[in-house]
Amino acid sequence: MQGAGLVFQVCSRLIIKGEKMKSRQKVFENIIHGIFLILGLVAVAAVLLISVYLIVSGIPAIRKIGLVNFLFGKEWQSTAADPKYGILPFILTSVYGTAGAVLVGTPIGFFTAVFLAKVAPKGVRRVVESAVGLLAGIPSVVYGLVGMLVLVPAIRSIFGVADGSGLLAAIIVLAIMVLPSIIKVSLNALEAVPKEYEEASLSLGATPIETYFRVSVPAAKSGITAAVVLGVGRAIGEAMAVIMVSGNAPNMPSLFESVRFLTTAVASEMSYASGLQRQALFSIALVLFLFIMLINAALNFFLKGKKEKN
């Protein structure tokens, strides 16, 4: 009987200890969940604060200038006696520059990712991945400096123009800058495709190249699309490198003439702007912010549609 009582006491103590451990673990998990919730709310709050600040700061200028005159006006003379605040040249330049950079950078980045994921030997892959990582870590001002000292004179010499600064130089620099994002995200998407898909395709008689482009790439389409959209966001939001190679003049977009992007318009004038000019620059920032939001919304819509189809 004493032995049975001792066993009962030991078991009771173990049960109590186990319950205490579970209680402590639950408290710890609740604390961790609370921390994650707070961090998530901080991120959401930051976006909301930025949105509200841009709206409050940017709307007054649009009201004074007029939405149509602001968005579709072709002249920007913010320091003139009779100032004009038309940002159509900035919008078109940003759209053309971003589109050109993505059109140039996407094929290069995509095929590089396919090569690294499916074809490249380990040694070659290691070298290329190191180079891509280095590209991602180079500051924007270095891209702009190299573009200004090397690319702009080259364009001037090759095409025989008075000044090599312009939209073409900006497109080339931006195309190089978006490469790391496109390559890395596309590479991760391709590597996430199950090996069974490729093995099944090869067993049915398909060649490796056919398997890569008819099986692996379609299966990784969502990730590759995300890579392109990230590249768009990177290109449309760049300022420092662009301001150094584009000429930064408020002209309508032209490959060989100085142009100004939405980002460079804000960066070049905000330091000395005041009054309506300063408000107009906040309005430009608001337009740029809305562009980025639309791009993200389009990406989420596309990815959601793909998931529902699958």
What are these regions (language model features)?
Residues 1-40, 299-310:
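Transmembrane alpha-helical segments of polytopic membrane transport and secretion proteins
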Residues 33, 108-147, 310:
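Cytoplasmic-entry segments and transmembrane alpha-helices of multi-pass inner-membrane transporters
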Residues 87-115:
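Transmembrane alpha-helix signature in integral membrane proteins
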Residues 133-175:
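Generic hydrophobic transmembrane alpha-helix motif, especially the helices
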Residues 139, 204-205, 218:
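Glycine/proline-centered hinge or cleavage motifs at structural transition points of membrane proteins
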Residues 185-186, 208-243:
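Transmembrane alpha-helices
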Residues 187-191, 195, 202, 271-310:
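C-terminal transmembrane helix and the adjacent membrane-cytosol boundary/short C-terminal tail
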Residues 242-289:
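Interhelical loop and adjacent transmembrane-helix boundary motif
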